[in-house]
Amino acid sequence: MIKRAAEALDRGEFLQEFIPVPEDLKITAGFLGEGDAQKALEAQTKANVEKYGYGNWYDYSVGEWGTKWDVGDDGATDVHPDGKMLHTYFDSAWSPPIQAYEKLTELGFTVGAMYYEGGMSYAGVWEDGVDDYYDLGGMNSTQVAEELPVELDEAFGISESMAEYEAENEEELTEWIKDGVEQNKKLGLVSE
């Protein structure tokens, strides 16, 4: 099963390999316009919901995988020499595929995963069915270093990159203040 997983990851079809989207759901998720095409889409969507609980691929992927797109194809899969374990990394759309981790566990995999989304300020560790989620919003680099497990922080360089960002912002703010003071001196608004 590990070899199959590694091959699917390399193809960028890991989730589809183990938690496949039914063919009937591979339809447009949205609006085709007026007329017969739209009516046919609506009828197929309704039939899909009745049969699968989802109207289309998008709803299924988000519901069953936890993300809208499949994962893999990063060329980052390493199979352990004993063939019983693999290590990989991948990007996913919007969120980690938590629902997929749960389903993979049901299929017999042991899943341990770490994730980080800097733009949305969250990180976490998923292991043995437990999602340790960390909301990083409003935290500075020191707080992040204290709050996150060391392994998670180091895997993504979270507190380190935040510290660099904070230092850059401090330099820019200091320069902006100095420029403002100099400008105010030139205008006679501040005495020397």
Task: Walk through the language-model features, giving the residues of each.
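Intrinsic low-complexity, intrinsically disordered or marginally ordered coil/linker segments
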Residues: 1-192
